[in-house]
Curated annotation (Swiss-Prot):
Pfam families noted in UniProt: Methyltransf_9 (PF08003)
GO MF annotations, alphabetized: methyltransferase activity; transferase activity, transferring alkyl or aryl (other than methyl) groups
E.C. number(s) listed in UniProt: 2.5.1.-
Functional note: Catalyzes carboxymethyl transfer from carboxy-S-adenosyl-L-methionine (Cx-SAM) to 5-hydroxyuridine (ho5U) to form 5-carboxymethoxyuridine (cmo5U) at position 34 in tRNAs.
Name recorded for this polypeptide: tRNA U34 carboxymethyltransferase
Length: 321
């Protein structure tokens, strides 16, 4: 089972220390309600060899390697363990010569977001809905002091811990298996990321307020989410599914999204990037047995989802508390 005590020790003397009033009890309760496969997944993490990497690159990729290559047997054992943690959705990872080719080329998103950010050097960062943590490692690569990701999905936690083990057990990033609605308002993070989360929320303004509550005064929000074309009054509310996803509730235009952010009290709100999701960025691989973007689009018109809505387009919005 994953041991969170090192994280408690890490934050005990930081601005996050108030979290210790609630977090240990929440995680004890979480352990009693975990997914039926969690014990199996966490054992897979334990089975991974403690390999020492001579080279780690988190600046241009998430990559570890050593001067003497793994034997083919060692490499196949690691691949076997990592494939037991499928599906791998966000990546890619390059670990001791093994290319974990995930469904999403999350490096594409990072390349769109990074040029617009306030420097991450020395910052304490919260990544909401962090998945298996790919972007967290890239934040560490930009010099972040501490990155905390929150995501309630147990598989993502085990994937994150598996990658951590193959990155010399780097403790600068930590994944906590909770949702933001379970976090007390800490007002302690210099930067808060919420990427690919807002459209899954039944109450998007509540989500934006929760993000604001975690930021220090003047801190930076990085919001990345689905948008549709239209004016300040345009919001798509899918009748049933959107791109085969059941849990999509509100997809605003950029103008409407900026209005929402200003309404909950953010300042200096600006859109810095808009990009249509491509079949190069989201696709099937050997590390994902499920459907992917090609299956979610109208086969005769890729500008539409299979339900007839505008195809996925994503905006990056920055704002300050």
């Amino acid at each position: 089972m994953i041991d969170f005590r090192p994280f408690y020790q890490q934050i005990a003397t930081t601005n996050l220390s108030d979290w210790l009033e609630t977090l240990p009890l929440q995680l004890k309760e979480w352990e009693t309600q975990t997914h039926g496969d969690y014990a199996k997944w966490s054992k897979i993490v334990d089975f991974l060899s403690d390999l020492h990497a001579d080279e780690i690159d988190l600046k241009s990729a998430v990559k570890s390697d050593r001067t003497s290559p793994l034997s083919e047997g060692e490499k196949q054992r690691i691949i076997h363990h990592l494939k037991q943690l499928m599906p791998w959705r966000k990546g890619p990872y390059h670990l001791f010569g093994i290319h974990v080719d995930c469904e999403w080329r999350s490096d594409f998103k990072w390349d769109r977001v990074l040029p617009h950010l306030s420097p991450l050097q020395g910052r304490t960062i919260l990544d909401v809905g962090c998945g298996s943590g790919y972007h967290m490692w890239r934040m560490v690569g930009e010099g972040a002091k501490m990155v905390v990701g929150i995501d309630p999905t147990e598989l993502f936690l085990c994937q994150f811990e598996a990658v951590r083990k193959l990155l010399n057990n780097d403790r600068r990033a930590n994944l906590i298996p909770l949702g933001i609605e379970q976090m007390q308002p800490l007002a302690a993070f210099d930067t808060v990321f919420s990427m690919g989360v807002l459209y899954h929320r039944k109450s998007p303004l509540d989500h934006l307020s929760q993000l604001k509550n975690q930021l220090v005064k003047g801190g930076e929000l990085v919001l990345e989410t689905l948008v549709v074309d239209g004016d300040v009054n345009t919001v798509l509310i899918p009748a049933d599914r959107y791109a085969k996803m059941k849990n999509v509730y509100f997809i605003p235009s950029v103008a409407a999204l900026i209005n929402w952010l200003e309404k909950v009290g953010f300042t200096n709100v600006r859109c810095v990037d808009v990009a249509t999701t491509t079949l190069e960025e989201q696709r099937k691989t050997d590390w994902l047995e499920n459907e992917s973007l090609i299956d979610f689009l109208d086969p005769n018109d890729h500008s539409k989802t299979i339900e007839g809505y505008q195809a996925p387009k994503r905006a990056v919005i920055l704002a300050n508390k």
